[in-house]
Amino acid sequence: MTKPILLFVLYLLCSCQVQHINQKKDKKMHGKWIEEYTLDTIRYQSIGRYKEGEPVKKWKYYANGKIIKKETYKKEYCKVRFYHPNGALQAKGITKLIEKGKDIHWFYSGQWEYFDTKKDLIITRLYDKGELISEKEIKNTKQ
């Protein structure tokens, strides 16, 4: 009885595919990437995916194990969310990729919303190619 079970487990182990991390294809980052570094005793980690050297899909950023930022890439746009140390949403908005020759830059674009640690909206800002166009402070009516 143990021999068939052992053979089955051996078959499962041999058929499992290993997911490679931090790989390059044609000298460009490709697939799942996990990057870690420490700065001033804070351990930072980012987890996401690259396709042909460009970040794609969802990325998450941590400081000492706590989420500090999430990004969702779709073509030349990226939906960004920043978080307070308590885990509450701090800011959210869109960035847009603009290429000029060899220069590539992500700019804040459209309306961004900023929240306090109690999750109340406190400021909205409107951006165009990274330039602040307008800002509106939200009066807190809660007491």
Residue map of PLM features:
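Glycine/tyrosine- and acidic-biased, solvent-exposed loop/turn segments at the edges of beta-strands
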Residues: 15-143
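Bacterial Sec-dependent N-terminal signal peptides
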Residues: 1-23
